[in-house]
Amino acid sequence: LGDVYKRQVNSLFEVKDRDALSTAYTPGVAEPCRQIKANPDDVYKYTFKGRTVAVVTNGTAVLGLGNIGPEAGLPVMEGKCVLFKEFGGVDAFPICLNASTREEVIAAVKAIAPTFGGINLEDIRSPECFDIEAELERDLDIPVFHDDQHGTAIIVLAGVLNALKVVGKRLEDVKIVQNGPGAAGTAIIKMLQVAGAKNIVAVDEHGILYPGRPAGLADHKEWLATVTNPERLTGTLADAVRGADVFIGTSVAGALTTEMAATMAPDAIVFAMANPNPEIMPDAAKAAGVRAVSYTHLRAHETLRHLV
């Protein structure tokens, strides 16, 4: 897998002789240290802080693989760093924390924050991720962004709006089922509601979310139960998707069966985004009568699996 390795660190300063070395390191570095001490904002002038981002995880919710730990999450963080550099020109560094609690993650990020111009939180399980982002946003003086929530929600909203144009439906009129209301799913629901969606049904592994559900609800799901499901449906995912115009999955592979998809409304739309394998394959969805399908792309994943 040597050729798959995604990162290296290169110097922008050529150390060609002893004078250059003494400028890059001691004693030359003493002067910018003095300047920054006198004016802390000069750290953006004299260091790489302003163009660097920390991509931080604790490995508790990596892709659809679950709690696989910080080491196993490192390839994902490296990949995200590639995206920052290739598409944004921003230098990013993967930070994989051996920290299982929200307090440990928050303390670790606060401790390393002086080095970076921004924090990208990644693959941290819910509901801890909500509190972690909120506290870091409140206490740090640099941007904090939880990609699983907000990045995913932005892209899904754009995709749903365009898919609805294709099938000739309006966001405010359609029934949307969101399966897997974790970090990404919750943010997607919030974004869709702000955009005008009025009938969203959230479903987790225990079934449809509604107030007072016997299976119980985590704090964020308790809130979701009050702001979604206006018809107060109960039951399973199969019950939720019956007559639905849009299915949005951020759950697990195979969650949406062909039989379920066949009960959706005419010209249905499916976003099968379980990672790395989708809730339903596109051929199966199309065979069930679904009009538009967006799904997790498998080709690179399968190629890498063969390399391993």
Pin down the residues of each PLM region.
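General beta-strand structural signal in soluble alpha/beta enzymes
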Residues: P94, N120-D123, V144-D147, Q178, ...
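N-terminal ligand-binding/catalytic initiation module
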Residues: D3-I142
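Glycine-rich phosphate/diphosphate-binding loop of Rossmann-like nucleotide-binding domains
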Residues: E71-P75, I154-V241
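Rossmann-fold NAD(P)-binding glycine/threonine-rich loop
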Residues: A274-L298
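A structured beta-alpha segment of the ubiquitous adenosine-cofactor-binding alpha/beta core
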Residues: E103, K221-A262
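Accessory "access/gating" subregions that flank catalytic or transport cores
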Residues: V241, L256-M281
